[in-house]
């Protein structure tokens, strides 16, 4: 099942400089809440800048769902510092509110008011707003308030250049894209390991359930949980997933990926056609009635990405210039970190993603896609179950989670040694030594620790205690915030940029109107 990559690791040991400059970026979502734990019902604060044009502070689905975006960097400590400074800046500006520290929101009733995010009067701003209306009408608004962490990761070009020479499975026409797609297929095969280790949504509000039936253990403050679950956010209860298998999206080559995704964006859906495009008052209900309104509606645990030029879609950018980096979307908010993620997680993610790049991934088909999906569901719903087994092939042969986890981590330890040699410290090796213990000791996992807190204190008390603790830390940090002046300038500039975009569109319309009447 798992390839012996000792020769590949030996090759990496001889060429350690080719993985020296890994670039990363972090996006963290968090709900603004009132001091009593209820959703904030105010608009996105003006003091935080324009969510349309601010480089680092924006909104996701709703007005109260903040999203923090770090610059890309090869320095982990810089990323963490920048993310802390973003949180500190925002905490100072919204002193009477707090940031919810969990992926799963505290829902006190089914009719919780949620304001869909707005982005001004420009064409782009309206598109973003209507797209979110579509998400609400297609999947419901509650499910779209679930928060997560997105981890962006890219290996240096020198790695891919050298890897191409030694790896016969890479396609020559675009070896970087081919390499990243190999990584993505392996994440589908083994990414549940990360969910087992760091999943932190073992419980969910009963208001998310609708008609779904699961054998939940108990009900605390309308919160339901499964005794061995890790990340209900990633299940069909929480994080809505478009069925990629039905769309025939298999990540085997970039052309077929783009073709399949374009087909979904342009194919009408019977289900979503019933919603309609506009209501009786002429207000938009969604962008279109197709299977996907746009490419970002494809919810997957990992996806290929590329920076886009103005006016360019992601698919256009990928088609022209190939894959630039990958985005991990299966990370829950770490409730034990004030910024939702810690350094140990980043170190383990680096190692695991390098490992996914080194291991050869067979081409995806419907059969092995279903096997992978079953493994993910095993971990999502019963990951900490004693003697949990994982399917190792399409014949449904199994090994225990402990066996597979330890096999993977033996490779990760060797990669850690190479990375530590580059940085002259033992951070990666230490992270491995600490994390490998999670397999034989499931009580060490984030989901187990978090569930114990929820059972003991309930979600509201636990959430508010941590939210207040983190808020105090961020307020105390503000005077020493090295980014606060930059963030103040960016806030002012973002409002100017939004206004400029809107004014340019007004001028364009006026000019076209006057020309039409000449």
Swiss-Prot record:
Enzyme class at the top of the EC tree: ligase
Q: Span of the secretion signal?
A: none
| One GO CC term on file | cytosol
Q: Which SUPFAM superfamilies does the entry mention? A: Glutamine synthetase/guanido kinase
Q: Give the record's pathway.
A: Sulfur metabolism; glutathione biosynthesis; glutathione from L-cysteine and L-glutamate: step 1/2
Annotated Pfam families: Glu_cys_ligase (PF04262)
Name listed for the protein in its UniProt record: Glutamate--cysteine ligase
Gene name on record?
A: gshA
Tell me which family the UniProt entry assigns to this protein.
Belongs to the glutamate--cysteine ligase type 1 family. Type 1 subfamily.
Query: Mind telling me which InterPro entries this protein's record contains?
Result: Gln_synth/guanido_kin_cat_dom (IPR014746), Glu_cys_ligase (IPR007370), Glut_cys_ligase (IPR006334)
Keywords associated with the record: ATP-binding, Glutathione biosynthesis, Ligase, Nucleotide-binding
Gene Ontology BP annotations? glutathione biosynthetic process
Cite the GO molecular-function annotations of the record. ATP binding; glutamate-cysteine ligase activity; metal ion binding
UniProt superkingdom: Bacteria
- Please name the Gene3D superfamilies in this protein's record: 3.30.590.20
* Reaction(s) catalysed by this chain's protein: L-cysteine + L-glutamate + ATP = gamma-L-glutamyl-L-cysteine + ADP + phosphate + H(+)
State which Enzyme Commission number(s) the record gives.
6.3.2.2
């Amino acid at each position: 099942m798992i390839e012996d990559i000792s020769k590949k690791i030996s090759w990496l040991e001889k060429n350690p400089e080719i993985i020296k400059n890994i670039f990363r970026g972090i996006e963290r979502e968090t709900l603004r809440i009132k001091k009593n734990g209820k959703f904030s019902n105010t608009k996105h604060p003006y003091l935080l800048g324009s969510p349309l044009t601010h480089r680092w502070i924006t909104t996701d689905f709703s007005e109260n769902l903040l999203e923090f975006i770090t610059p890309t960097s090869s320095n982990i400590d810089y990323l963490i510092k920048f993310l802390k400074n973003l949180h500190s800046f925002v905490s100072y500006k919204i002193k009477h509110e707090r940031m919810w520290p969990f992926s799963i929101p505290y829902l006190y009733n089914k009719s919780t008011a949620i304001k869909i995010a707005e982005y001004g009067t420009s064409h782009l701003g309206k598109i973003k707003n209507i797209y979110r209306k579509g998400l609400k009408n297609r999947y419901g608004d509650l499910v779209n308030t679930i928060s997560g962490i997105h981890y962006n990761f890219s290996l240096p070009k020198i790695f891919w250049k050298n890897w191409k020479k030694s790896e016969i499975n890479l396609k020559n026409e675009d070896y970087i894209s081919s390499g990243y797609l190999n990584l993505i297929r392996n994440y589908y095969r083994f990414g549940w390991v990360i969910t087992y280790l760091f999943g932190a949504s073992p419980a969910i509000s009963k208001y998310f359930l609708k008609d779904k039936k699961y054998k939940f253990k108990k009900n605390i403050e309308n919160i339901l949980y499964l005794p061995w679950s890790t990340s209900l956010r990633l299940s069909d209860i929480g994080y809505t997933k478009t069925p990629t298998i039905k769309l025939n999206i298999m990540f085997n080559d970039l052309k077929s990926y783009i073709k399949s995704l374009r087909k979904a964006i342009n194919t009408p859906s019977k289900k979503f056609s019933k919603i309609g495009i506009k209501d009786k008052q002429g207000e938009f209900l969604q962008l279109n009635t197709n299977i996907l309104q746009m490419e970002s509606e494809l919810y997957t645990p990992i996806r290929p990405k590329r920076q886009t030029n103005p006016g360019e879609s992601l698919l256009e950018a990928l088609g022209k210039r190939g894959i630039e980096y990958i985005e991990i979307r299966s990370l829950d908010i770490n409730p034990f970190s004030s910024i939702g993620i810690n350094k140990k997680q980043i170190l383990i993610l680096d190692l695991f993603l390098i490992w996914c790049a080194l291991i050869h991934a067979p081409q995806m088909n419907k059969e092995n896609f279903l096997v992978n999906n079953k493994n993910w569901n095993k971990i999502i719903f019963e990951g900490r179950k004693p003697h949990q087994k994982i399917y190792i092939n399409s014949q449904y042969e199994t090994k225990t989670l402990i066996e597979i986890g330890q096999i993977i981590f033996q490779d990760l330890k060797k990669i850690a040694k190479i990375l530590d040699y580059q940085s002259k410290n033992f951070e990666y090796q230490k992270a491995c030594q600490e994390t490998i213990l999670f397999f034989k000791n499931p009580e060490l996992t984030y989901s187990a620790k978090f569930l114990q807190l929820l059972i003991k204190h309930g979600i509201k008390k636990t959430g508010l205690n941590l939210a207040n603790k983190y808020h105090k830390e961020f307020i105390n940090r503000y005077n020493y915030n090295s980014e606060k002046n930059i963030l103040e300038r960016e806030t002012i500039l973002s409002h100017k940029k939004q206004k400029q975009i809107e004014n340019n569109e007004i001028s364009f319309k006026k000019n076209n109107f006057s020309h039409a009447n000449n």
